[in-house]
Amino acid sequence: MWLSNSSVGRKVVMSVTGIALVLFLTFHMAMNLVAIISADGYNMVCEFLGANWYALVATAGLAALFVIHIIYAFWLTMQNRKARGSERYAVVDKPKTVEWASQNMLVLGLIVIVGLGLHLFNFWAKMQLPELMHNLDMHADTLTLAYAANGAYHIQQTFSCPVYVVLYLIWLFALWFHLTHGFWSSMQSLGWNNKVWINRWKCISNIYSTIVVLGFALVVVVFFVKSLLCGGAC
């Protein structure tokens, strides 16, 4: 199949899944900002996105996008390493036209994956998962189930801890680098690769990625500061 047998096809898959994930991040960031404005409003969104059939279908689709994106990322990385052979061990000057993020996308991607695991542990495992277990008549802790739709509570608990705050900010820093390169690179792979448009996409990537990451970081910092003012830091 062309999408898996050719380098161009794999890049197209990477690009399409990457753009879809960027759109999800935008929605997720906007949703999180609601928590700063209104805890009740945020909890309403969380309840709407609980263990309902449409939310579960969306979650499954999102998980598939992540898995495909990660698999193809490693696949392309290994392919590029194999193509370079022993040349990759040679000491040469780094090309000025090659960005730092481009040279370290694998490392940045690994940090993003670890951060994703941490995020799933702190939120998905305490919110949608208990509701899903309850709906399937599986054992779910009563207290955990009671707080499953209280997203504001989980944000407050997570970001009152300085360790989590630092880890999340490191994760977001890596995500920013990953997005700034990945966004315009995706457009390039999809054909927007002439000199005029590639420069425009690089500019758009930097602005867009900065807005998204700052939105996430704002939630982390605001809730941490609130916890300090309330004396609730762990």
Residue spans for each PLM region:
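Membrane-embedded alpha-helical bundles that constitute the cytochrome b-like, heme-associated redox core
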Residues: 1-234
